[in-house]
C-alpha cells in the first residue's frame, strides 16, 4: 500500500495506489513464478493472432487509459495533501504511519498474494474445476481474514511500543504521539487490502479489468472528497498535525470502498463466498509456497522505502515526507505504463502456463517487455533532463 489503494495498487497502503513500489517489481516476480511451472524445450508455437491477441491488446488499452486517469487523480491528491500539510514533521509522521502497515500489506497481501493465487486459480478454471477454484478462493479469503485480523489487532494494541522504533531523535513528544495515533487508524488497511486482493485476483482471472483499473481512481476521489469534508472538523494546522487524522480516516474509508467495488463486480461472474475453510487443501500450501519469492522481492523494495524514511528522521523531521514525494514523482511513469501491461498480461500468462504453452508465454513476455521499455525509457530520460521544473510544477 503506497498511499494508494491499489489492491490492487496500489496506490494502495499503498492501499493500492498504483504508485506503490511493489507494482514496480510485479512483472519480474510474476514471470518467475509462472516460468517455474513450465518445462524447457520443444518447438515454440505461434501466438494466437485472434481473438486472444486482440483481447489482450484491448484490455491493455482500456486498463492503461483507466490507470492514467487514476494516476492523474492520485497526483491531484498528492498536490492537495502537500498544500494542506506541507512537508513538516506532522506530514512526515503521516508518511511513516502509512509506510509501516503498507509494508505488511505488501508482504502478506496485495500483489504477492495475487501473483501466487492467479496461476493456481486459473489452472483449476482451465481444467473445468470451477467449484474447486471457488472453494480455494473462499478458503484463502477466510484464512486471510483470520490471520490479518489477528495481526491488525495486535499492532493496534502494541503501536505505542512498535512505532517509536522507526523514528530518530528529531521526532519527539507530540510528533511521536501523532505517529502512533495515525498508525492505529491506518493499520486496518492491511486487512482490507488482503481481502480485496483475493477478490480482485478472481476478477482478473476472468479478464475483468475495469473495476480493478478504476478502483484506484475511486480511492483517490473518495480521499479527496472526505479530506475536504472532514478537515474543517479538526482544529489546528501545520504545526500540531491534528487535521491529519481526517486524512487517515479518509484513506481507511476509501480502502473499504475498494473492497465493496470488488464484491459488487464479482456478481458479474456469479462468484459467491462460501463458509468453507479446507485447511488440508494442498493448493493452499501451493499458493503460499509461490508467494514466498514474490514476498521476498516486494519486501526488499518496500523495506528500502521505509528505511529511507527512518534514516530521514535522523536528519530532519521534514525529510521522510520529502523523500516520499520524490519517490512518487519518479515512480509515476512506472505506474502509468508497467502496471497496466503486467496486470492485463498476467492472467493470459497464467493460462499459457496451465496449458504448458512455453513458446507462447516467452513470446508474450518478450512483447510485454518491449512495450514497457518503449514507454519507460523516454519517460526516464525526460525526468532526468527536467527534474527541477517537474517538482516545482507539482509541489
Regions found by a protein language model. Name each.
Residues 2-395:
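Membrane-embedded alpha-helical bundles of multi-pass transporters/translocases
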Amino acid at each position: 500500500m503506497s498511499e494508494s489503494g491499489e489492491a490492487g495498487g496500489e496506490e494502495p497502503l499503498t492501499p493500492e495506489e498504483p504508485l506503490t513500489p511493489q507494482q514496480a517489481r510485479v512483472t519480474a516476480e510474476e514471470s518467475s513464478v509462472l516460468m517455474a511451472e513450465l518445462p524447457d524445450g520443444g518447438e515454440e508455437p505461434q501466438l494466437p493472432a485472434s481473438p486472444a491477441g486482440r483481447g489482450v491488446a484491448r484490455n491493455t488499452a482500456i486498463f492503461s487509459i483507466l490507470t492514467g486517469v487514476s494516476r492523474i487523480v492520485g497526483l491531484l491528491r498528492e498536490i492537495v495533501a502537500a498544500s494542506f500539510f506541507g512537508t513538516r514533521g506532522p506530514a512526515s509522521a503521516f508518511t511513516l504511519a502509512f509506510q509501516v502497515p503498507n509494508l505488511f500489506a505488501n508482504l502478506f497481501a496485495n500483489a504477492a498474494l495475487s501473483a501466487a493465487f492467479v496461476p493456481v486459480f486459473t489452472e483449476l478454471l482451465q481444467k473445468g474445476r470451477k467449484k474447486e477454484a471457488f472453494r480455494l478462493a473462499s478458503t484463502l479469503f477466510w484464512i486471510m481474514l483470520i490471520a490479518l485480523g489477528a495481526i491488525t489487532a495486535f499492532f493496534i494494541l502494541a503501536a505505542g511500543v512498535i512505532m517509536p522504533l522507526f523514528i530518530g531523535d528529531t521526532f519527539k513528544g507530540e510528533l511521536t504521539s501523532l505517529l502512533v495515533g495515525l498508525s492505529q487508524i491506518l493499520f486496518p488497511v492491511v486487512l482490507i487490502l488482503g481481502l480485496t486482493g483475493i477478490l480482485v485476483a478472481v476478477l482478473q482471472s476472468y479478464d475483468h479489468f475495469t473495476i480493478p483499473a478504476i478502483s484506484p481512481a475511486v480511492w483517490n476521489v473518495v480521499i479527496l472528497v472526505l479530506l475536504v469534508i472532514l478537515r474543517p472538523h479538526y482544529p489546528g494546522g501545520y504545526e500540531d498535525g491534528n487535521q491529519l487524522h481526517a486524512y487517515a480516516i479518509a484513506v481507511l474509508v476509501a480502502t473499504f470502498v475498494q473492497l465493496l467495488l470488488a464484491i459488487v463486480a464479482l456478481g458479474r461472474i456469479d462468484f459467491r463466498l462460501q463458509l468453507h475453510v479446507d485447511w488440508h487443501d494442498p493448493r493452499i500450501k501451493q499458493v503460499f509456497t509461490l508467494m514466498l519469492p514474490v514476498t521476498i522481492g516486494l519486501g526488499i523494495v518496500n523495506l528500502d522505502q521505509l528505511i529511507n524514511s527512518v534514516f530521514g528522521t535522523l536528519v530532519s523531521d521534514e525529510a521522510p515526507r520529502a523523500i516520499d514525494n520524490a519517490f512518487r514523482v519518479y515512480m509515476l511513469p512506472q505506474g502509468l505504463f508497467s502496471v497496466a501491461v503486467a496486470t492485463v498480461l498476467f492472467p493470459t500468462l497464467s493460462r499459457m502456463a496451465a496449458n504448458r504453452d512455453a513458446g507462447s508465454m516467452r513470446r508474450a513476455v518478450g512483447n510485454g517487455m518491449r512495450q514497457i521499455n518503449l514507454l519507460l525509457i523516454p519517460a526516464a530520460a525526460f525526468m532526468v533532463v527536467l527534474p527541477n521544473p517537474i517538482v516545482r510544477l507539482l509541489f
